């Protein structure tokens, strides 16, 4: 049996400030018959961004990195914003013309649409919540990579 497991993360140092630095990262594992076959880790840096934008970009880029959309995919997220947004809130936003529960425009609409588009390309996808900084190996790995990206001077 084939399965892909993926973790994504996003962060921003100076979130809410005019000048800040942020990044997203994702980590993928490809398993066949309970044997780890291949891994991939990637990410990128951004300036003048937010935590939520980077969390969304991490998940989007994770989904884009997978060529075979028919393989079962488990996406592990420590971001409740992305997890609840893509599994619950988005249905209401679509029905309500992209207004949130306070009747305000949904933030990051274009990224949500891109994430939904990428999600819908998969035949078997599950989003799973993990607690950040709790020792969960995949989450720790992607968090380390994310911080390394933000620490890099280029």
Indicate where each model-derived feature is located:
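RNase H-like nuclease fold core
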Residues: 1-57, 64-66, 143-154
């Amino acid at each position: 049996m084939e399965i892909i497991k993926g973790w994504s993360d996003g962060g921003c140092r100076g979130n809410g400030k005019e000048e800040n630095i942020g990044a997203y990262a994702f980590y993928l594992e490809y398993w066949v018959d309970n044997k780890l076959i291949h891994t991939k880790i990637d990410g990128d840096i951004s300036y003048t961004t937010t935590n939520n934008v980077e969390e969304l970009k991490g998940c989007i880029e994770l989904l884009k990195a997978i060529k075979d959309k028919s393989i079962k995919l488990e996406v592990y997220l420590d971001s409740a914003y992305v997890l609840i947004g893509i599994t619950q809130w988005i249905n209401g936003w679509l029905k309500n013309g992209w207004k949130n529960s306070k009747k305000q425009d949904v933030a990051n609409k274009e990224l949500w649409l891109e994430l939904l588009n990428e999600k819908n390309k998969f035949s078997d996808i599950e989003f799973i919540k993990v607690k950040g900084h709790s020792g969960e190996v995949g989450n720790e790995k992607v968090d380390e990579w994310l911080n390394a990206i933000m620490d890099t001077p280029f």
